[in-house]
């Protein structure tokens, strides 16, 4: 079956009819763009297609500007709208990982509802991905490599060229007289993928002609085995995970280590996080799940933090330490730090009404300076028939997790705490 006919059949089964093509300007994505342009013209068996393309300008090569221009010229030729997005690459975890993260986050910004991202990954890419997973010591999920349709970073992705080799794409490009750019970094064998592509895999393909197809079969077996595990554990998983970012630990400690790690991986996958290593999972189980009951353990996973409270795990973003932050309330609206939103105040004849998120509190007017602070460790009186008590006890009774307590705006009149907005008011001691 040729490329065009195969993709046409794939699109007949696809739920989306709007597609955003990831266009680098290289051979693979140029072929992909050409095929979709032809389908737009052909379409006897397809409903009308909405096609756009996006080029990510990483700024890592001196040729990056000329690549962007090439992509624009190509899209003008095919009459396909193009988005060119410049990104800053965070190299903390390596250029490859940083570029990939920046690329997908930029694409996510432009992907519309009901639109599907289309990438030009092919059979050779699949083999490379499998070997990279093997090098990392990945389990079934990692060795399952790429699927023709999947979800990544919360985006639906279609990879229609996954069943074709690079040689087949080259033959198509030459037949159609297509022009494409070549990224000079593809020859740099310091990068693992390039080392595999340029040094290792050619030797294997020379010895075994159908090596890529064999790898694809193995990857598919791994994917199916992982799906089977997920199916068998789905009922138990639902008992532990009824809220997406929360994982209940009831009965969890009684399971085998294999069952524990499988359920945790399902939870992390549900939240679209990259899979941790076996060492990291073991550390999470030992240092967080099996930590002492009174502890407030946490575990950092790239840009997320796993925390434990009242026998549940919670997934949050990393939070800034706001305990030394004091903000003077001098206007009706105050912008709070660390993405906490705005605190606003309205007044009537006798009172001030403070609003934050979905909460509000009404306090008497004052001539004292008003400030907003975060975190307090003293004693307060909240309940009329009880004496002053440690604020920690009040937070515990209200069921507020420790990491949230220092993120709730505290209203001070002078140096006197008056209220934790939305949670409690401080009463005068009798």
Swiss-Prot record:
Transmembrane segments: none annotated. It holds the Pfam family TilS_C. ATP binds at residues 24-29. Its EC number is 6.3.4.19. GO terms for molecular function: ATP binding; tRNA(Ile)-lysidine synthase activity. It is an enzyme of class 6 (ligase). It comes from the Bacteria. GO terms for biological process: tRNA modification. Its main location: cytoplasm. It is found in: Cytoplasm. GO terms for cellular component: cytoplasm. Coiled coil: none annotated. It catalyses: cytidine(34) in tRNA(Ile2) + L-lysine + ATP = lysidine(34) in tRNA(Ile2) + AMP + diphosphate + H(+). SMART domains: TilS_C (SM00977). Keywords: ATP-binding, Cytoplasm, Ligase, Nucleotide-binding, tRNA processing. The keyword Membrane does not apply. The keyword Ion transport does not apply. Belongs to the tRNA(Ile)-lysidine synthase family. The N-terminal region contains the highly conserved SGGXDS motif, predicted to be a P-loop motif involved in ATP binding. Ligates lysine onto the cytidine present at position 34 of the AUA codon-specific tRNA(Ile) that contains the anticodon CAU, in an ATP-dependent manner. Cytidine is converted to lysidine, thus changing the amino acid specificity of the tRNA from methionine to isoleucine. This is tRNA(Ile)-lysidine synthase. It comes from Haemophilus influenzae (strain ATCC 51907 / DSM 11121 / KW20 / Rd).
